[in-house]
Amino acid sequence: MAGRLGRGMWWGKRGRGCRGEGTLLALGLLAALGFLVWRHGPPPLRAARRAPPQPPSPDSELLRRPVYAKPALDPGALGELGRAVRLELSPAEKRRQEESIRRHQINIYLSDRISLHRRLPERWHPLCREKKYDYYSLPKTSVVIAFYNEAWSTLLRTVHSVLETSPDILLEEIILVDDYSDKEHLKETLENYVAGLRKVRLIRANKREGLVRARLLGASVAKGDILTFLDCHCECHEGWLEPLLARIAEEETAVVCPVIDVIDWNTFEYLGNAGEPQIGGFDWRLVFTWHSTPEREQKRRKSKTDSIRSPTMAGGLFSVSKKYFDYLGSYDTGMEVWGGENLEFSFRIWQCGGSLEIHPCSHVGHVFPKQAPYSRAKALANSVRAAEVWMDEYKQLYYHRNPHARLEPYGDVTERRLLREKLKCKDFKWFLENVYPELHVPEDRPGFFGMLKNRGMENFCFDYNPTNEHQVTGQRVTLYPCHGMGQNQLSFV
């Protein structure tokens, strides 16, 4: 289903029309209504939003107004304009700070002292400020934020950031999905707080669902034409929403991600930059990776403000047409908690006729925790599901690098395979050749890969375990007891 889907594929069958005199009467009423609208001015806002694009009007500044205005700038406030904060603490205060980091893997002690409404430095390309939008023609979005035992300040800073940077005319609602939290501050206290905010509603899961199903719970009650998923510790840059919605208005099968800027977990410094965004990729262990934009994609784009095609997404932040999300089969509900769902959805988007893009004019800051605060034990099974459904014979390259994955229970994928057949999706070879030609496909011939065993020391193998996950090359190879799991003991010659 390459290109734009026909409207007949999106909406159900039309009801039968009236006949005879009823038809004439209906036509007459419609004509009269059209005359009244022509005589008495433009139609209501919702109808006008479905009209063809119009030239920017003088009231565009009015249309850009967010749901809430930010408080006046306080240049001396902690963390204002994304500045790093380092507190001088007493021993007792330092212990409380360390406890907050241990519990959340984020410096919540500091976060609680930074305004929920802080302003961010400008981090987009200068040309992005010049872009004009026809706000009446853009669709509305529901922003879905799932959380589990999230700290108060990071969760509420996310909510206020959306409310204070999103045009009122474009934000249908924020849906907070509580994935069965047990912290007291997320119960009645949160309910009372949210009750005082426009366009924010809180729904609760009846049991622990995990990120995938919690997001689907939010999507199931969303009223907006577009679903925008955000993590629960984000801050939105000025003008972040319009580019996402405008691109989907142009192409309904585009799934669009913002540029993800890093917010330091310890100092809350906003580390985004206005340079060329990186795109998502993966390696044959099915680990998500970042890469520079390839030359072929740079040549395809006509402007620095055009969206960038990306083979994969990080997964936490993106916008998608609600109808197209449903058409694609939404999330794989057989996946647990989080991990691997981003690659599975990325493969499905591309192989089933859509496109996955990153928009350089949309920036959202994200606090990357010191380490994952909750277990990712189910991530392996999620990756196996992705490999089994979408990777065809190339799944063997994954299994060679993760031998233990062959033994991992991954549930029933019959429905997902039937979905692939129903949507007439392309094979993984097409994906590699057309979407991600930069990814090297190894031969993996027998005898050319495996573990290198030391013959002088019984049961010891070459082991490569970088101490810094962001710098995986140029580090020392050591000897370590052979574990038979591949991964950091897998060698190729």
What are these regions (language model features)?
Residues 2-56:
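N-terminal signal-anchor transmembrane helix specifying type II single-pass membrane topology
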Residues 139-144, 173, 344:
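Cell-envelope/extracellular polymer assembly enzymes that use nucleotide-activated donors
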Residues 163-204:
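Acidic donor-binding segment of Leloir-type glycosyltransferases
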Residues 188, 205-222:
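Glycine-rich, basic loop-to-helix element that forms the pyrophosphate-binding segment
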Residues 212, 287-319, 327:
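A recurrent flexible, glycine/aromatic-enriched loop bordering the glycosyltransferase active site
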Residues 227:
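Short aromatic/hydrophobic "clamp" motif used to bind/position activated sugar donors
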Residues 235, 239-291, 355:
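Conserved donor NDP-sugar-binding/catalytic core segment of glycosyltransferases
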Residues 434-493:
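Lectin-like carbohydrate-binding module/patch detector with strong preference for beta-trefoil
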